[in-house]
A protein has these predicted regions:
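Symmetry-related core transmembrane helices of the 12-TM Major Facilitator Superfamily/SLC fold
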Residues: 159-176
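Cytoplasmic helix-loop-helix junction between adjacent transmembrane helices
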Residues: 99-136
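Helix-breaking motifs and short loop linkers at transmembrane-helix boundaries and internal kinks
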Residues: 36, 68, 89-94, 123
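Residue-level signature of mid-helix packing/kink "hotspots" within the transmembrane helices
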Residues: 22, 50-58, 141-142, 260
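Conserved MFS/SLC helix-loop-helix module at the cytosolic interface between two early adjacent transmembrane helices
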Residues: 55-91
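Juxtamembrane intracellular "pre-TM" segments in multi-pass secondary transporters
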Residues: 1, 181-221
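Paired small-residue
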Residues: 83, 94-102
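Extracytoplasmic gate region of multi-pass secondary transporters
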Residues: 24-25, 215-257
Length: 261
């Protein structure tokens, strides 16, 4: 049982974390209705969350490489989801922005160490493991708006369900991964140590090459363009649904889920 949880734990945690990230855009119509926000203010909520997560992740990734910080994982997704829950108590636009920033910090804490957890515990099938990890995040993004849609039925206090999900995730992490120390590597990984050593040696040889900044620039442009388009659509799909199509705010969550899926 524990071995199974250790195998599927990282994608589950990724799903939990991205529940919060995906739900934020679905809450925009709720904020517009309750705080009278305009398009610029609505977009700024998502902008703050995304920028903080993007800037902080490389820094926290460096920290994760230098020091063993497995607690980044439960703390990260807990901060993300509790920040979303706390928006139920927000009394001003500035408070929403602050909580959006905090949710971004939580996401930045989670991702680097979670990726390292996959590598440490499942390096013998790293391709499949990272595939499951990515699917978990995509599922969280897609299901987050559906979960957040409950706010339009039950009111803002429904957001505290995100905190309950975070607590369940923490319990799962404590059961499967805490107290393992350096022994968190699977037996199969130990058997594959020689092959891993060969891969590391090969990586060292390849790392002596020169940086291809032209190719890097092209790749950066493609990734940045995709991310900009993704974020813009995530922000304005629910807004356009309630303003142009005159749809119900609760149904805008379904439109966002269809987009994320």
């Amino acid at each position: 049982m524990k071995r199974m949880i250790r195998k599927y734990g990282p994608p589950i945690f990724h799903c939990i974390n991205d529940f919060g990230q995906g739900s934020l855009a679905a809450l925009i119509p709720f904020f517009i209705a309750n705080f009278g926000l305009n398009y610029y203010q609505s977009a700024t909520i998502i902008f703050c969350n995304t920028v903080v997560a993007s800037i902080a992740q490389p820094i926290l990734g460096y920290v994760a490489d230098r020091w063993r910080v497995p607690w980044f994982i439960p703390v990260g997704f807990t901060v993300t989801l509790v920040s979303i829950s706390a928006m139920a108590m927000a009394t001003s636009y500035e408070m929403i922005l602050a909580l959006s920033l905090l949710a971004g910090v939580g996401a930045a804490l989670f991702h680097p160490e979670a990726a390292l957890l996959v590598n440490r515990t499942q390096s013998h099938e790293i391709g499949n493991a990272m595939g499951r990890f990515a699917v978990g995040g995509s599922a969280g993004f897609a299901l987050g708006p559906l979960l957040a849609g409950g706010v339009y039925v039950f009111g803002g206090q429904f957001l505290w369900v995100f905190t309950i999900i975070a607590l369940l995730g923490v319990l799962l992490y404590l059961y499967a991964f805490m107290g393992e120390g350096e022994a968190d590597t699977d037996d199969t990984d130990i058997a594959d140590a020689a092959d891993t050593g060969n891969r590391e040696s090969r990586a060292k040889v390849l790392s002596t090459g020169t940086n291809d900044w032209v190719s890097f620039g092209k790749l950066f442009f493609v990734i940045a363009s995709r991310s900009i388009l993704f974020s813009v659509l995530a922000i304005f799909i629910p807004i356009l649904y309630i303003t142009v199509i005159n749809g119900e705010a609760s149904a805008s969550s379904l439109a966002l889920t269809a987009y994320f899926a």
